[in-house]
Amino acid sequence: MIRIPKMRISLLFFFVAFIWNLPAKGQSDSQPNIIFILVDDLGYGDIGVFFQNERKSLNDRSEPWIMTPQLDKMAMQGAMMTDHYAAAPVCAPSRASILMGVNQGHAHVRDNQFDKEIGKNHTMAEVLRSARYTTVAVGKWGLQGKGEGPDWPTHPLKVGFDQYFGYIRHRDGHEHYPVEGVYRGSKEVYQNYETVQGLDKCYTGDLFTAKAKDFIIKHQAKDSQQPFFMYLAYDTPHAVLELPTQDYPAGGGLNGGIQWLGNAGKMINTASGEVDSFVYPEFANATYDHDKNEATPEVAWPDTYKRYATVNRRIDDQVGDLMQLLEDLEISENTLVVFTSDNGPSRESYLPEEYVAYTPEFFNNFAHFDGIKRDVYEGGLRTATIAHWPIHIKAGTVVNSPSISYDWMATFADAAGAPVPVRTDGVSLLPSLTGKGKQEPSQVYVEYAQGGKIPKYAEFLESHQGKLRGQMQMIRQGEMVGVRYNIQGQEDDFELYDVTKDPQQGTDLSSDREALQASFKAAALRLRVADAQAPRPYDEALVPSLEIRKPKKGLIAKTYDINSPWIPKLSQKAIANKKVNRLAVQEAPAKGNLVMWQGYLDVPEDGKYTFSANRGESHFFMRIHDISVLDGNYATDHSPIGSVQLEKGLHPVKIYYLKETQTPSLELFWTDQEGNKEEVPAGAWYR
């Protein structure tokens, strides 16, 4: 297959975008409704405006294509985010990072830890609920924790959602007919804590769309003055590649499209006909030039690819249906809708042996990149992401600055006026999306481990084909991406690529970028903590110290007045600041209820240091570099403990303490590798 170069966005795109950007009537500039649409295993190259339209424009009959008119329309009306990344190249860790707002070096769910509890900390839903949002999750979950249920440790209703409807278990999302279980057996759909009966012939993509629409309609009828947040997690196009029962109902929106009926045996209006049967007409009889010879007859697309194309087109219809509902209810203007995928394209179909094996080569779902699901090259992580919010995002916006999926918690909190927990690794993307304010750079970092190799696809560079995966890392700073595969230790070099000029990552610049190499190696240690359940070959590496010219003894103590249920990321100016000799609440300025000490910690010797604190029942948080070392910001009924490997020398530190008692006090301890525990002495602090 051929590699298609990037093409300029057409004048037609900008003309249509201009027309759609004309202001509409009827909505105030208030807290927006927020809908986060997360699809499963959709490649960057699966969406028309990101790649498939380019294939069509070349009209190469050996290169089949898929159209996504509804998603194209959404992109033209809003923002295309061309350089947006998934937090991990597989679903469970990717979703966990999204919902918790942290990178994989801080997440409780890493690697292939399917069905592991998401962790006890602030979630996207809890943050938005604090800003009076009604919160609902629809679709695939897979982050509930051990047990048979329904009382799982991190069931959606226990982590900030008011309502839930969908598949709780990860594996259930691999079958799209929960009753008939056509290929992988029947599955359980839950509404809150109860299993749902009567879902005969319900194709899950349609079912989740119907339930999402039903919630929005009922919410607007009853609580239209209260904003809502919806986490809509489709289980498609992930295998098994099952077909819907029938064509998509006409119309869309309030009175058309998929409709929730609520009757057992006829729960939705497409729960009739034959399960796993309908192929879109444009694919049913599609042919292609299989041998790249115009003199020979074309052949039909294999049924496997008719299925994949139908599933993708169905997603397009489902999103269009939902967007039409927002228009019909006159809430589109002030509803922020984000569409993205959890990782890159898959090569799985889970179909019986008589079907042709599925490969993303047929449609080039990986677009201009190398790598697929489970890779940290661009094809495994770059996601086709669209943001739509007419009142604030201009039509035709193209955002090409790098960002990552754990930025959405901070973004949604910013839009809602909610405080962002200080633990959050993400940043608000509103400046990029709206063109207002200065965009803070995203911290784009991924770590992941997976056995196996990169597929030997002809489209991929020979140097990438068959490459061992193993322990992997990716970090992006500006236009540069650093990648490590099959890591044996911290001294392994990153491959370095300028992905703005070399999206396929064919020219490794590491041989003449020694300073950048050192910077990437240091950066990758300064934003993560080790996890015993996901060990890494660099867990014992020492976090490099900094060279600081003429440091002075002591710290800077800043105080703030905050109105927040937790310690937030701070963007406002301090109301007071003072140079202090030690870490003591009594020495900080008296004004304000939040103290933040900033400076450097002088580590006397290389080694592992374990930190702990006596902070009473007050909220408390400590970062060294960008490492979350001590987190007492979620639960205040226990003392946090955190360990980190530190090189001798100075390390930047920020320590936060919320004064919540009549006699506020804070003591910080460290224990060295010999087991000696002491309060961090005043002489260890510099500014």
Predicted segments with their positions:
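Extracellular/secretory pathway-exposed regions associated with glycan biology
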Residues: 533-610, 614-687
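Active-site segment of extracytoplasmic enzymes that catalyze sulfate/phosphate-ester chemistry
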Residues: 36-37, 44-136, 146-148, 159, ...
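Short, solvent-exposed turn/loop segments enriched in Gly/Ser/Thr/Pro and often Arg
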Residues: 41, 50-51, 78-102, 113-116, ...
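Bacterial Sec-dependent N-terminal signal peptides
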Residues: 1-29
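C-terminal, low-complexity/hydrophilic appendages and adjacent surface loops
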Residues: 183, 373-379, 448-510
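Active-site-proximal cap/lid insertion segments
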Residues: 41-65, 168-403, 409, 413-427, ...
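Loop/turn elements at helix/coil->beta-strand transitions in domains of secreted/extracellular proteins
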Residues: 30-35, 77-82, 130-136, 159-162, ...
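Polar, surface-exposed loop/tail segments
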Residues: 69, 98, 140, 144, ...
